[in-house]
Amino acid sequence: MVKLGFHVSIAGSLDLAVERAAALSCDTFQMFTRSPRVWAAKPISDGTALAFKKALERFGIGPAVDHMPYLPNPAAEKPDIYAKSIFTLTEELNRCHQLGIPYLVTHLGHHGKEDGHRKGQEKVISAIGQALDDSEGDTMILLENTANEKNTVGGTFA
């Protein structure tokens, strides 16, 4: 069965994303669980998670799909960015688990000039493995491909 959905806003609260998707006659939808433009995330309260799950049930929409924030770069050459990227991926997997979201979309990032494409791929694989090991639940990570711009990982799988 084909499902149609859109990326919807979480403005106001996470459960409003479900209502917005329903108002658009979506069968499924994608969202951010937090601002995509900053590293820090406000914790999701148990009440917020429950309201989100109840909205999914009430509107019969699913599965919900989460999208990683824009800042993480699991292929990063700089150690501090790489570490923050793994932390954020792990944190986002835990947020998905808390909300009952089965899928998390992530960009693969950009490798540094010194690292090169192959090392960038290896870093992404390692980052994803570590985040899966360190997180709760069984959320599936979906890898978003790119247009194969300079230094991107995910534009080709060669």
Model-derived segments and spans:
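N-terminal pre-domain/capping segments
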Residues: 1-91
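Active-site acidic/histidine proton-transfer and metal-coordination neighborhood
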Residues: 74-158
